């Protein structure tokens, strides 16, 4: 049975995308808190200071530290590697690279609320 009090870290450099994700997640009935980060570097800082993140939604193309770089850092860290990561992208070619780097799954943008809920259910056990 899936938890209904998830804490999700949403990582995207586009503020509008972050707001839409947050709205969809909070309306899903499964998420109690959405933490936002504008790049991979900020997200790593959040992950190092919190131990309650249940899921990461990660954009690939971002400044400072992109999604692939962040995936590599997270998967190399013994304390973080177990956190499920769903990659969000508009670039079909980035899916395979993200999965090879340790992403659990992916969603193509633009994201629909029903797809997001199904993806959450599939990666959170």
Predicted regions: what they are:
Residues 86-88:
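Hydrophobic/aromatic residues positioned on beta-strands within the core alpha/beta folds
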Residues 45, 68-81:
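Short amphipathic alpha-helix used as the core "switch/output" element in two-component signaling
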Residues 111-122:
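C-terminal output helix
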Residues 59:
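Active-site residues of response regulator receiver
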Residues 15-35:
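Two-component/phosphorelay signaling modules centered on CheY-like receiver
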Residues 69, 91-105:
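Alpha4 helix (beta4-alpha4-beta5 surface) of REC/receiver domains from two-component response regulators
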Residues 62:
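Receiver (REC) domain active-site loop signature in two-component systems and cognate sites
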Residues 36-45, 67:
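Helix N-cap/capping motif at the beta->alpha junctions
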């Amino acid at each position: 049975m899936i938890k209904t009090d998830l804490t999700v870290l949403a990582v995207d450099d586009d503020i509008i995308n972050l707001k839409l994700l947050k709205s969809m997640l909070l309306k899903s009935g499964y998420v109690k808190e959405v933490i936002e980060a504008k790049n991979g570097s900020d997200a790593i800082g959040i992950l190092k200071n919190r131990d309650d993140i249940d899921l990461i939604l990660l954009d690939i193309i971002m400044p400072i530290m992109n999604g692939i770089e962040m995936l590599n850092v997270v998967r190399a860290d013994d304390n973080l590697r177990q956190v499920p990561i769903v990659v969000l992208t508009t670039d079909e070619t980035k899916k395979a690279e993200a999965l090879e780097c340790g992403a659990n799954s992916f969603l193509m943008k633009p994201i629909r609320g029903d797809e997001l809920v199904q993806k959450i259910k599939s990666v959170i056990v």
